[in-house]
Amino acid sequence: MVDWPDPGTPVRLTVKTWAGLAEHTGLALPPAGPKLVTLKLVNGYNISFPHSYVEDVEELDEAPMVEEEPEPEVEQDESLPLVHLIHTGGTIASKVDYRTGAVSARFTPNELLDSVPELRGIARIRAVNLGSMWSDDIRPRHWNRMLQATSEAFSEGAVGVVITHGTDTLHISAAAMSYGWAGRGGRPPGRIVVTGSQRSPDRGSSDAAENLIAAVHWAAHGPEPTGYRDSSVVVLHAGSSDGSCAVLPGCATRKYHSSRRDAFKSINQEPIAHVGLGPDGPSIEMGEPSAYDARTEAIAPMMFEESTKIAQFVADAHLQPDMVQAAIDANYDAMLFHGTGLGHLPIADPQEDSPENTRLRIMLADHCAAGGVVVVVTQTIHGPIHMDVYDKGRDSRWCSLTRAEEGGHSEP
């Protein structure tokens, strides 16, 4: 049994390896698992060893405890544009508490400017902390809070806002911001950027700082939004290496990869722009210009109805009529089907051996005839919906199913 010191204690750990004894110096953390010791190394990475590998644990001299004093308000360049940073969660604006190993929000202007000093020359920062949520726990009520925070930012003189967000559902919230501000044909008063990081700030490979710099630069100095692809944008790494961040349309972006730094790509279209991050500071390289004139500026965003219930189904061999009937019986406001190929559902029985297909067809037709809302998109990442290529598509029209005809792929 290893006598492991309290979290936050400076230690020198000696462990047995195949090459002999090795020493590691850092801060003790809570064990990452049973019968493990875990250390925060000086390079920011965590390392764990089984108890059986531990040869010696030496506690180093404690650093003198200094009583923290309130920090004075950081001075910012008043000539720079004002940008509000709205924190909802995620690791991009977080710090590690080395006493506990926990991650907490780092979200005062002082903390942000100290950790990412490049922001000082880009914009004046005003921080707003909406919470620290796992992105998969976000609901429509949280989209409304984000929309309200963006509206307040613009009314207080901000030229842009940056929403920091966990990456797993970042693209969905970005789409919500886009539809909230532009869903009625308008455009937001300023730039709305949603960003996050795939790697936490305590890791040497973290993308947090570059993503935040690029996002703030776009929010402060990007072009005025037109209300089309750019009502909100996603700004994250363009590739696995540093040096460039992509500016992606908030209503047409998807997370492609669970862990890569360039996990997000735009769907059926090119990025709006790229933000280069070179030694001379950030710079914007625009893509193809918009073919549309800017919409009228919206006075306020459209809020989402928080009680709306939408049932989602995947069209495959296991889609059963009773699953759909349960949603109908529960009075869901709408049903969304992720169809196959060009947007098809299992509603035909050519071999007369799958009566559930016929039941599903009749059930959906009756539901639509009674005023129910049924929308079909395609599971494929790219490509449109097209209902006139196969009989299945024309049969769906007969059922009165609604197709997302233009770019109806399974993005937000």
Question: Residue ranges of each PLM-predicted region?
Answer:
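A glycine- and small-aliphatic-rich helix-loop capping segment at beta-alpha/alpha-beta transitions
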Residues: R99-R106, A175-V193, A208-A214, W218, ...
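Short Gly/Thr/Asp-enriched flexible loops that form oxyanion-binding sites at enzyme active sites
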Residues: I163-G190, I347-M363
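Internal gly/pro-rich beta-alpha loop/helix module
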Residues: I47-F49, G196-P279
